[in-house]
From Swiss-Prot:
The keyword Lyase applies. Homotetramer; dimer of dimers. It is found in: Cytoplasm. It is an enzyme of class 4 (lyase). This is 4-hydroxy-tetrahydrodipicolinate synthase. Catalyzes the condensation of (S)-aspartate-beta-semialdehyde [(S)-ASA] and pyruvate to 4-hydroxy-tetrahydrodipicolinate (HTPA). It comes from Blochmanniella pennsylvanica (strain BPEN). Coiled coil: none annotated.
Length: 299
């Protein structure tokens, strides 16, 4: 279930800045038919920090409703307060959510023991599978492999989204965790190399606009056909890079609108829209990758 191309889904909004449920359903349907393995709802790319708690829960539950059992839905439930993360996680205890994705606490920068106790407390509050999420560039703290190995011994902590982009981490984690512990990349640029070293998939920003391509890339990688997967990856490389020309999800939401996947290009402050210069760069990347001329994928 937790392998292959897992999309870090954007949260579409209408011109009033409220969640656009029509576009959200369209996105879910698109991923169902495109080979995406699962959906992460309201993670970093889904603007978790820009939604109220009520909206956060509603978007996850709407995504689950629109999926209707066709794709597993993983709920983003991280917070920098342990009590808040526990409360948010427990909102989904009686739902059909497949798992929770829980980011390391941001801003307060806990030490390694604090990280261990944080995730231990969350896992003890629920029976839902927990996927750890390490993204130091966003949070200001780095969960080290030795801490992950301690957490991997907890029954319902089943894997990690490792988004440092440091491929040495894969080798370190492989040596320290049990063989069933799921290793997912959180960095599209290095995802294929991550999978070559033992990862089983990626929680992908690129999959928002290249769902079929990312699904095929991951399928080939999991079949050890890295040569063919590399051809796809090379074609997508301009997009992997351009989607981070500004803070995520500013570029990817613009690309989704350009490709007709959503109705409006709207973000919430403090996120602002992509500059004209960066739009030109991203548009060229879409053209170079062939995505701009293959819009039949997005009907």
């Amino acid at each position: 279930m937790f392998m292959g191309s897992i999309v870090a889904l954007i949260t579409p909004m209408d011109l009033k800045g409220t969640v656009d449920r029509i576009s959200l359903k369209k996105l879910v349907d698109h991923h169902v038919v495109s080979g995406t393995s699962a959906i992460v709802s309201v993670g970093t790319t889904g603007e978790m920090s820009g939604l109220t708690h009520e909206e956060h829960v509603d978007v996850v539950m709407r995504t689950l409703e629109f999926s209707d059992g066709r794709l597993p839905v993983i709920a983003g439930t991280g917070a920098n307060s342990t009590a808040e993360a526990v409360a948010l996680t427990n909102k989904f205890n009686d739902s059909d959510i497949a798992a929770c994705l829980s980011v390391t606490p941001y801003y307060n920068r806990p030490n390694q023991e604090g990280l261990f106790q944080h995730f231990k407390a969350i896992s003890e509050s629920t029976d839902l599978p927990q996927i750890l999420y390490n993204v130091p560039i966003r949070t200001g703290c780095d969960m080290l492999p030795i801490t992950v190995s301690r957490l991997a011994k907890i029954k319902n902590i089943v894997g990690i989204k490792e988004a440092t982009g440091n491929l040495n981490r894969v080798n370190q984690l492989k040596q320290l965790v049990h063989e069933d512990f799921i290793l997912l990349s959180g960095d599209d640029l290095s995802a294929l190399d991550f999978m070559k070293l033992g990862g089983v998939g990626v929680i992908s920003v690129t999959a928002n606009i290249a769902a079929k391509e990312m699904a095929e890339l991951c399928k080939l990688a999991n079949e050890n056909d890295f040569s063919t997967a590399q051809h796809i990856n090379q074609r997508l490389m301009p997009v992997h890079q351009a989607l981070f020309i500004d803070s995520n999800p500013i570029p990817v939401k613009w690309a989704c609108k350009e490709l007709g996947l959503i109705s409006h290009y709207v973000l919430r402050l403090p996120m602002t829209v992509l500059s004209e210069v960066h739009r030109d760069v991203l548009k060229q990347a879409l053209i170079d990758s062939g995505l701009f001329y293959n819009q039949s994928n997005y009907k």
